[in-house]
């Protein structure tokens, strides 16, 4: 979930800044064609900037340390396991990092398959068996091999485009009026207010679509892990999460591999654990 939150937060920040620039400067103009062109440019700018910054931002956010030279048996095992799985999945060896956190957590990120990162928490290494941790690593490797971050960026770019375009087209219609001479005029204040409100509203709807896709790709990554290490290991890893964390203890936690069972599934980046386990058993 962490990589998704970072991606969406960066994307929203860029979208907000660019949206204000559009409104203040009026750069998109009044024509539908002009608005569409600017929506495409600015819509994809937010998602692509988020994509290319994802690896650096994720690593800094957890104060993770990339393993350049293994210093102990655990780090050697991590490097060897990720290397073996990456080779089996047909992708270049990603950077591997460890960060200090009591959460049982792991994530993968990066703009391309050749510039990716797999990070695991000390909480995961301390609370999972080797077989369970191996399944989690395979899950993250599958995210990379599936190109999930790139696909998410493209989807977010399309969603951004529709958010910008629709909010400004509607705002233009609402704020426009004709004077006594029959000339069309537009109230800048009304246009700014309406476009900002609609952008936030459409942004929420867009996030529901983005979260749906995120849940879909989690099922795919689980299946990918099953193909790399066997579905029983992946099921064991998910069951371990159920044992370690009661639903109420997940509230407000920042997790990449886990989910909060109490939240509305519409806004969840990960499917409920029981659904993931059931899907694996049905493979």
UniProtKB/Swiss-Prot annotation:
UniProt keyword terms in alphabetical order: Cell inner membrane, Cell membrane, Hydrolase, Membrane, Metal-binding, Metalloprotease, Protease, Transmembrane, Transmembrane helix, Zinc
HAMAP family reported for this sequence: Pept_M48_protease_HtpX
Keyword field contains NADP: no
Identification of the protein by name: Protease HtpX
Transmembrane segments: 4-24, 33-53, 147-167, 190-210
InterPro entries given in the database record: HtpX_protease (IPR050083), Pept_M48_protease_HtpX (IPR022919), Peptidase_M48 (IPR001915)
Molecular function as annotated in GO: metalloendopeptidase activity; zinc ion binding
PROSITE patterns, per the entry: ZINC_PROTEASE (PS00142)
Protein family: Belongs to the peptidase M48B family.
Pfam families assigned: Peptidase_M48 (PF01435)
PANTHER family documented for this protein: PROTEASE HTPX
Membrane topology value: Multi-pass membrane protein
Gene that this sequence comes from: htpX
Cofactor(s) the record lists: Zn(2+)
Main location: membrane
Subcellular localization: Cell inner membrane
Cofactor note: Binds 1 zinc ion per subunit.
GO terms classed as biological process: proteolysis
A cellular component term, taken from the record's GO annotations: plasma membrane
């Amino acid at each position: 979930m962490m990589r998704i939150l970072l991606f969406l937060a960066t994307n929203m920040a860029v979208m907000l800044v660019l949206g204000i620039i559009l409104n203040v400067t009026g750069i998109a103009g009044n024509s539908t064609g002009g608005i569409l062109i600017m929506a495409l440019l600015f819509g994809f700018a937010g998602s692509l900037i988020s994509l290319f910054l994802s690896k650096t931002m994720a690593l800094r956010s957890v104060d993770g340390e990339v393993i350049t030279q293994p210093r102990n048996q655990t780090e050697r095992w991590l490097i060897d396991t990720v290397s073996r799985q990456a080779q089996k999945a047909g992708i270049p060896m990603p950077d591997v990092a460890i960060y200090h956190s009591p959460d049982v957590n792991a994530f993968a990120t990066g703009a391309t398959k050749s510039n990716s990162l797999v990070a695991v928490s000390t909480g995961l290494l301390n609370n999972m068996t080797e077989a369970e941790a191996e399944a989690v690593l395979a899950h993250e490797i599958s995210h990379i091999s599936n190109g999930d971050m790139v696909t998410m960026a493209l989807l977010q770019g399309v969603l951004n485009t529709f958010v910008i375009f629709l909010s400004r087209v509607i705002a233009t219609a609402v704020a426009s009026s004709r004077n006594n001479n029959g000339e069309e005029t537009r109230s800048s204040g009304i246009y700014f207010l309406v476009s900002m409100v609609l952008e936030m509203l459409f942004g929420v709807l867009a996030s529901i679509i983005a979260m749906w896709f995120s849940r879909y790709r989690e099922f795919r990554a689980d299946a990918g892990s099953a193909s790399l290490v066997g579905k029983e290991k992946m099921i064991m890893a998910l069951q371990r999460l159920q044992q370690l964390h009661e639903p109420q203890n997940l509230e407000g936690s920042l997790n990449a591999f886990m989910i909060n069972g109490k939240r509305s599934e519409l806004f969840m980046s990960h499917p409920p654990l029981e659904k993931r386990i059931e899907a694996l058993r049905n493979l």
